[in-house]
Amino acid sequence: MSEPIPLIVAQYELKGHPTRTEHWNLVAIISSSQTYTFEVRGNTDSFTYVAEPTPVPLNKILMYRGGCQVGGIPTHSLPQIAEMLGEIPIVKHDLSWDCQTWVILAIKLLKSAGFVFAQVDEPYVRERLLEDMNRWEEADLTVDERLLASGGESS
């Protein structure tokens, strides 16, 4: 049985949104060059759920601004998780619903299935994301870099 791979909430600089300054998604970090992304893309009238391998390491994505580890998942569970997250209803034409709303719903669902740490909730995520954004601004290591350097345990 393989060790669980880290599951993080990743944040990216977002421009032009009426209320948000970061786009969020969930990322399973398989290796330094291999990740799997779960997210809602689009705008309020076109939101779409996407689950796919990411062809570029996180630290090479120009808008990436760090993240926080929320859990761990077995690599063989990626298809199951992709299917589970695809069941989250997508709300269109409602300005109060966006990618951050979807990520919080996804965390709750994955927590109920045992893939997310017990202490993780929305305030936990927001606090850790702010901390990692500050690290990024200071050119310090972001969560993915810390996880890869330590073999899977974020500090």
Predicted segments, located by residue:
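Activation targets extended, charge/polar-rich intrinsically disordered C-terminal tails
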Residues: 86-155
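Non-catalytic ligand/cofactor/substrate-binding and regulatory segments of enzyme domains
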Residues: 1-97
